[in-house]
Amino acid sequence: MSSLIFYTQPDAAVVATDTLAVSSDGSPFSFCTKAGYIPHLKTIIAGTGAGGFSSQWLLHASTRMVVHGIHNLDFHTPKGLGELWETYKKEYSLTDDSTTTVYQFGISEESGEVVSFAYRSTNNFQSEPLQFGTGVKPACTVLEGNLLDIIPDMMVEQRKNEAEKPHNERVYIGGEIIALVLTNEGCNHIKIGEFEDLVADEKAIFENFNRMTN
């Protein structure tokens, strides 16, 4: 699970995530990239839910599909995600109640403006066009102000809210806060913050890794 905060308007999209991945017991497992950009499609792919699934889809979309632009990609995405999800669940022995949502944000090859879509496993990955505006997952207060300045505060609130939930229901958020800023000219990756326990989590990650490998 992850923090995902995004904002879209006709000429730009901002997609921000944390970087912490945890083991099944909630202990820090690794730091990872949770959103990526495909330059030749002018498209950002991100996801929540089953860790790593959206990254596998990004690799598939960027190297194994003959498509031109986000609308063309969107046409093929529901079928492609459905097939990949079945393989992914078997490979990682996921239970039937496991869920994931994949998001795609891109510059339209038709209009030159930002378009975005969500694909939820609970809805058979059907394409859901998203309106311009702000999206947050998990829930938090949508603040006003400079977006890159307020996103870290919003993620801190998300993490505080999740910390009050039972471990098996909690979304674990941590590491660094990375924002992707997409315009018609390209995409910039920007570190806009980090969590106060970043160093402690990094130490725990290497300690856990050493225990597993020794």
Task: Please identify what each model-predicted range represents.
Residues 2-90, 122-214:
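Conserved short S/T/G-enriched processing/targeting/catalytic segments and their helical context
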Residues 111-116:
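Structural motif
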Residues 92-93, 102:
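Accessory structured domains or lobes within enzymes
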Residues 103-110, 180-182:
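Short hydrophobic alpha-helical segments used for membrane anchoring or interfacial signaling
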Residues 43, 98-103:
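Generic beta-strand structural signal
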Residues 94-98, 172:
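Short helix-terminating capping/connector loops at secondary-structure junctions
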Residues 97-100, 118-126:
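Long, charge-patterned amphipathic alpha-helical coiled-coil/hairpin "stalk" segments used as oligomerization
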